[in-house]
UniProtKB/Swiss-Prot annotation:
GO terms for cellular component: phycobilisome; plasma membrane-derived thylakoid membrane. It is found in: Cellular thylakoid membrane. The modification N4-methylasparagine is found at N71. It comes from Nostoc sp. (strain PCC 7120 / SAG 25.82 / UTEX 2576). (2R,3E)-phycocyanobilin binds at C81. Belongs to the phycobiliprotein family. Gene3D superfamilies: Phycocyanins. GO terms for biological process: photosynthesis. It is a peripheral membrane protein. Light-harvesting photosynthetic bile pigment-protein from the phycobiliprotein complex. Allophycocyanin has a maximum absorption at approximately 650 to 653 nanometers. Heterohexamer of two alpha chains, one alpha-B chain and three beta chains. This is Allophycocyanin subunit alpha 1.
């Protein structure tokens, strides 16, 4: 839930107008909107490159994943792994635009650990892949934008553990 929605829900629950502090937080949120949209656009525009870089980094760091018997062994399973990385990148962009982790949580990470466990997918490798996405994104973004985006990647990694 965005800061705007949270503030309105809280004020309405107390049958009051928004407080000066709530209005200041909303003002800051709105002022940061251009940055959040710029970051999301850059990640979206470069998603194929970012996913490929992250996959390459993951497979170099975790060759067991793409070796015979690994969860990403073979062309089809490697494509599935890259599809999952693309999915997490998309979730990160949702969180960035919202300025909140709620979309990430509600759309994508609830129950994901259990799903990967049931599939025999090494969850730590998925987390490593998301960290690789964060690294790839940081080379594309300014330091300030990378710091803003980084917290959303970190949230996904934390949710996977």
């Amino acid at each position: 839930m965005s800061i705007v929605t949270k503030s309105i829900v809280n004020a309405d629950a107390e049958a009051r107008y928004l407080s000066p502090g709530e209005l200041d937080r909303i003002k800051s949120f709105v002022a940061g909107g251009q940055q959040r949209l710029r970051i999301a656009q850059a990640l979206t525009d470069n998603r194929e490159r970012l996913v490929k870089q992250a996959g390459d980094q993951l497979f170099q760091k975790r060759p067991d994943v793409v070796s015979p018997g690994g969860n990403a062994y073979g062309q089809e399973m490697t494509a599935t792994c890259l599809r999952d990385l693309d999915y997490y990148l998309r979730l990160v962009t949702y969180g960035i635009v919202a300025g909140d982790v709620t979309p990430i949580e509600e759309i994508g990470v609830i129950g994901v650990r259990e799903m990967y466990k049931s599939l025999g997918t090494p969850i730590e490798a998925v987390g490593e892949g998301v960290r690789a996405l964060k690294n790839a994104a940081s080379t594309l973004l300014s330091a300030e934008d990378a710091a803003e985006a980084g917290s959303y990647f970190d949230y996904v990694v934390g949710a996977l553990q």
